[in-house]
């Protein structure tokens, strides 16, 4: 499972999260299962074809049916960015641990306003409606009829069924960027498939998985690993973010913290991204992962604030939007994403 973490008791550095998270958003299919891989060095390839188990192809999508696309713009000065990342980890460099704020990162390496305007103009002229742009100019959402998307990106879009009756669609041919977009766009997402899943599940052995005599308590973990909370550092003044597709009831969290007991002084708040449901569990049993993540962070850093970014599903678009909102909100120093899929598998080359 993917769990991104940094110690909550360390001095606060702006934008190590910003630079790393921004760098991952533009990469097409970080959570991909198995794709039709074409030449990875071809800048015209905006999106490959994602292969997921259990998909049922329902045929070509109606020409007038709406399709949402997400475009991730390229960073400026990529060589300079790569060098800076190396220097920030080099003890002999003057840039060692000298991190940028999210605003500094966006100004130095992010897309410019002129580049964003060029992209939105190209899309609008092609018949797209630009529905949202991120504050750091990195992500652009747009919608258009399927036939417009197919013609513009030289692809073919099919409707598919994926584990439910929700309306899902995907490109079944690689999507090609028009010449005008190649210098501006790193990747485009032309599907709304759920590409990740949580991993929490009941233990296969018999007996309860919770309670005073089963499993390790927060105190047991804190003592065994000599966590900072056992040395007077409870995370106060720091904030952790969780990206997940279900909320968890406060009553459940309160029961957990009261049982052990843990004196929580930090806050737990929610942010809805792309219509994620706040106030009740959603997406089947995924709330168990939310409970596990929130209780783990809240139990081992009781003074830290936690912001749960609730997304509607574990599709690429929602995951990227949540990561980008965390960067724009400038609250969290650490991000937890406890979900994942199979590694990307490409063709073997001799």
Where are the model-predicted features located?
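Bacterial N-terminal signal peptides that target proteins for export
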Residues: 2-17
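Short hydrophobic "helix-edge" motifs at membrane interfaces and signal-peptide entry regions
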Residues: 18, 135-136
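Substrate-binding/charge-relay-adjacent region of secreted/lumenal peptidase catalytic domains
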Residues: 33-135, 141, 146-347
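Boundary at the C-terminal end of the N-terminal hydrophobic targeting segment
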Residues: 28-32
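Bacterial N-terminal signal peptides
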Residues: 14-26
């Amino acid at each position: 499972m993917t769990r991104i973490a940094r110690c909550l008791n360390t001095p606060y550095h702006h934008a190590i999260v910003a630079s790393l998270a921004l760098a991952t958003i533009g990469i097409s299919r970080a959570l991909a299962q198995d794709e039709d891989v074409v030449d990875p060095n071809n800048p015209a390839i905006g999106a490959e074809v994602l292969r997921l188990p259990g998909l049922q192809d329902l045929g070509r999508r109606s020409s007038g049916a709406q399709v949402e696309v997400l475009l991730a713009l390229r960073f400026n000065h990529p060589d300079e960015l790569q060098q800076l990342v190396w220097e920030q980890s080099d003890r002999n460099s003057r840039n060692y641990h000298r991190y940028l704020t999210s605003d500094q990162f966006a100004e130095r390496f992010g897309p410019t306003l002129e580049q964003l305007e060029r992209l939105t103009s190209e899309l609008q002229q092609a018949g797209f409606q630009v529905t949202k742009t991120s504050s750091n100019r990195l992500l652009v959402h747009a919608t258009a009829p399927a036939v417009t998307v197919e013609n513009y990106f030289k692809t073919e879009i099919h409707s598919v069924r994926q584990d439910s009756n929700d309306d899902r669609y995907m490109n079944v041919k690689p999507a090609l960027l028009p010449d005008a977009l190649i210098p501006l766009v790193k990747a485009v997402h032309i599907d709304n498939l759920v590409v990740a899943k949580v991993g929490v599940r009941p233990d296969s052995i018999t007996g309860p998985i919770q309670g005073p005599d089963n499993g390790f308590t927060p105190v047991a973990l804190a003592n065994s690993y000599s966590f900072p909370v056992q040395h007077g550092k409870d995370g106060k003044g720091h904030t952790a973010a969780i990206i997940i597709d279900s909320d968890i009831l406060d009553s459940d969290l309160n029961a957990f913290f009261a049982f052990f007991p843990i004196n929580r002084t930090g806050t737990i708040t929610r942010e809805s991204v792309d219509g994620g449901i706040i106030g009740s569990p959603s997406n089947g049993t995924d709330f168990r992962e939310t409970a596990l993540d929130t209780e783990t962070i809240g139990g081992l850093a009781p003074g830290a604030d936690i912001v749960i970014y609730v997304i509607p599903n574990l599709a690429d678009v929602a995951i990227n939007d949540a990561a980008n909102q965390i960067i724009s909100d400038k609250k969290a120093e650490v991000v937890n994403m406890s979900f994942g899929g199979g590694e990307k598998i490409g063709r073997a080359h001799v």
